[in-house]
């Protein structure tokens, strides 16, 4: 049997197309967070589950290429996080990086992502420096930052009469950034900071720090910490009777923290959050899916992991490539409307601007179910929550 040249040409083209499709490398997403330490309940395995939910919901492929997820436990060590980020980019071919909890690790990874020109989506870390003097054209600080936390909770408590403050601060980048931002808000609204004490990350005994705070005779104890540190400091403040003379201000609290502390101890606390599992029908439906897999309601960081992943994949699809600069250009064009935020946009300094919420922890009598823990008492428009972009000091925003 003879084959004419057109048949041979078509056969050759089909063979080449099949070979190309077979050889197309996967799109690789990297995720580095605390998987086993003090912040693991905030992000950790639940963050992995949320990202995998997004990959599944997107169809498992983008640009005809399979989507793969690389994960790593940074153990809250900045040098380990930076080294693994470099390895993910240089050896494993990661196309982007999602930074989980711990600002010191995010600050260490940010210049690595910039050097490799890969999108760096910061979800769990909150230090405003990330989009300040250290900003890069590849950063997308997605969920929150210390400025927004301070402007929400700090102002609300000063407005309600909490004029004198003492800070119990986690002794690393995030805690110091949160304390600094909160102190500025307190003083700008007519309050006064009487002092601060620094506790190492993952402390178990806060008694000496709490007694120092009580001795200051401040009206408010500002907790510039998070995760297990926030839980332990609030529980111990209640046990030692600190709450009889001082009002607690949890500057970063998660739904899992309140669940762990319990409403009898946490009731009445104000907190600022970008998201709550029951804030909308869309958020509720997604959270129920997450709950079926993880058996806890998601934190805002885990919800942010899902949203950031979906947003990145949409940008890749729109750009028609995984090239970092082109994907970032698409991210800067996008308005994000999903179960996590409405009308979110990426500012020139790499900050995702969106609404935040002032919440108050319910009393046991007000709560109707195990995870019915907050009332959202005020929506804070994004520009008000995050403040003027020029104030961050990012050279890209001049």
Language-model features, listed with the residues they occupy:
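Bacterial N-terminal signal peptides
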Residues: 9-18
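Short terminal targeting/anchoring segments and short Lys/Arg-rich nucleic-acid-contact patches
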Residues: 1-2, 18
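Extracytosolic ligand-binding ectodomains
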Residues: 2-10, 23-398
């Amino acid at each position: 049997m003879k084959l004419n040249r057109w048949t041979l040409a078509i056969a050759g083209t089909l063979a080449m197309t099949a070979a190309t499709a077979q050889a197309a490398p996967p799109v690789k997403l990297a995720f580095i967070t605390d998987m086993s330490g003090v912040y693991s309940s905030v992000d950790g395995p639940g963050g992995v589950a949320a990202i995998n939910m997004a990959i599944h919901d997107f169809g498992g492929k983008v640009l005809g290429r399979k989507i793969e997820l690389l994960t790593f436990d940074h153990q809250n060590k900045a040098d380990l996080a930076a080294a693994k980020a470099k390895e993910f980019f240089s050896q494993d071919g990661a196309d982007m990086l999602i930074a989980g909890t711990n600002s010191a690790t995010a600050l260490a990874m940010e210049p690595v992502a910039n050097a490799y020109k890969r999108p760096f989506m910061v979800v769990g870390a909150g230090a405003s420096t990330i989009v300040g003097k250290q900003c890069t054209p590849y950063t997308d600080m997605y969920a929150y930052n210390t400025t927004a936390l301070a402007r929400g909770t700090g102002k609300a408590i000063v407005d309600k009469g909490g004029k004198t403050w003492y800070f119990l601060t986690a002794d690393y980048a995030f805690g110091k950034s949160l304390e600094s931002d909160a102190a500025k808000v307190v003083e700008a609204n007519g309050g006064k900071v009487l002092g601060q004490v620094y506790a190492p990350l993952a402390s178990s005994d806060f008694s000496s720090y709490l007694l120092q705070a009580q001795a200051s005779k401040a009206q408010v104890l500002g907790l510039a910490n998070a995760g297990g540190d926030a839980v332990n400091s609030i529980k111990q403040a209640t046990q030692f009777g600190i709450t009889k003379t001082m009002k607690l201000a949890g500057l970063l609290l998660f739904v899992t923290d309140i669940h762990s502390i319990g409403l009898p101890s946490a009731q009445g606390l104000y907190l600022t959050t970008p998201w709550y599992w029951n804030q909308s029908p869309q958020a509720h439906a997604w959270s129920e899916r997450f709950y079926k897999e993880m058996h806890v309601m998601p934190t805002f960081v885990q919800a942010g992991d899902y949203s950031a992943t979906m947003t990145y994949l949409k940008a890749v699809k729109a750009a028609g490539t995984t090239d970092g600069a082109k994907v970032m250009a698409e991210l800067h064009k996008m308005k994000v409307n999903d179960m996590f935020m409405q009308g979110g946009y990426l500012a020139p300094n790499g900050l995702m601007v969106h609404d935040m919420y002032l919440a108050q922890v319910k009393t046991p009598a007000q709560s109707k179910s195990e995870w019915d823990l907050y009332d959202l008492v005020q929506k804070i428009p994004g520009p008000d929550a995050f403040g003027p972009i020029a104030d961050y000091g990012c050279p890209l925003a001049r």
